[in-house]
Amino acid sequence: MLTRSSGVLMHITSLPNAFGIGSFGQSAYEFVDFLVETKQTYWQILPLTTTSYGDSPYQSFSAIAGNTHLIDFDLLTQMDLLKEADYALVNFGDDPTNVDYERVFYVRRTILEIAVKNFLANQAFQADFKNFEKNNQLWLDDFAEFMAIKEYFGNQALQKWDDKKAVARDPKTLEKYRTMLADQIQYFKVTQYFFFKQWTELKNYANQKGIQIIGDMPIYVAADSVEVWTKPELFQLDEERNPLFVAGVPADQFSATGQLWGNPLYAWEEHKKQGYAWWIHRIEESFKIYDVLRIDHFKGFSDYWQVDGKAEVAKDGSWQPGPGYDLFKAVKEQLGDLPIIAEDLGNIDDKARKLLTDCNYPGMKILQFGFEDVSGESLDSPHYCIPHSIVYTGTHDNDVTNGWYNSLTEQQQQYINDYTHRYEDESICQAMIRQLFATVSNTAIATMQDVLDLPASSRMNVPSTIGGNWQWRMQQSDLTQDKKDFLEKMTTLYQRANQEK
């Protein structure tokens, strides 16, 4: 990310298809072709890990296992694991512009069970599957067992399982469930094989076309996760694996009362004793599926916001010291220099800035934040961008540009129009993308919603809210030739065109 470049932020779930949720199928390959056509370098996505309650990719049952909602049925059909009749008439949802997660959860399971049954009955796949099991044994068995037992208890959270011996991982109890739930455990292993096979093939296609994938790693894991189940010593928990303290942030740009995330906090002293082995493994696994890695909430590594585990809001918390450079020094010693982006938004102080400097990771700039301050003093303003940074119009947590602009005061709108020298026939999305690509930041990322000039209804997430998020889906008809032409023109004009292809 040392040369001028650009890309588009678009999560897999937002891709168009007939299966209720975006997948690794034809539309994903067509999206890569669109990026190539418009001379982009990066496709940025949200975490690919499993989603849980609230459908957030930042609250996962596993820090490593993939989201099987993204498995493409047509690709399974090409492997002779499904027939089109198995899914052609299924109702995946009534609104093609939004994901119906509850419906997707139930109907996809039935179809995937057919594919798994056919897969296990076909000897031709078994050698490759055994290699997959062997190469992923550090996490795959635990994940499959966790999910099978969780399902057995009605998908209740780990802490609410009826069998406390299972929660505590009593060896005899676990052996009982391994025998009783053998078929279900195998289902979760095979669907992970499907996920990683399809994603690897898509990523290889993108890389061959000169497109790199920017992935995303949440700083925390969910309380209801395989990590909390198998490695409780790495978290601040009570004897029943309930979080003693939970994560969040105080009041910021996104919420006046702060954000209560609810994730268990790390027992950093224990991580240090173990040489940060869990983190090194997690980051190593991330770079097997991404080319560049954005680490969410980088501030939390210098100081993290600690809230009582029973609190209802995040504002009554306190800052506690994180591991600092000690963690990233250990990562560098084991894995070398890595292309990492630090999400350094929010309450960034001198200590966090020093950590960013010590790590030499590029930080982020958000033009929406910069333009909200009509004094021009915001460090997110275009004139304060620096080459060693990634600049965005907004992220998945921001409103899309149309919605954001319409929420501003007349003074703020006039400031933006004056600053960008907005043309009379130019949409606000075009003006913002033009300004974005003109900055000195080495990498500029536009959201797909802004590329498509979409309204506020296409917003991906409203922080500190539950329900109604992560649902937006693009329609193929949204991507018209004039939208492609504009993106390519801005990319070329501001010297960001991909030189690889």
Locations of the language-model features?
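Outer-envelope exported proteins of Gram-negative bacteria
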Residues: L46, Q212-I214, P218, V292, ...
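Surface-exposed amphipathic alpha-helices with a cationic face
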Residues: V36, W199-N207, K332, L356-T357
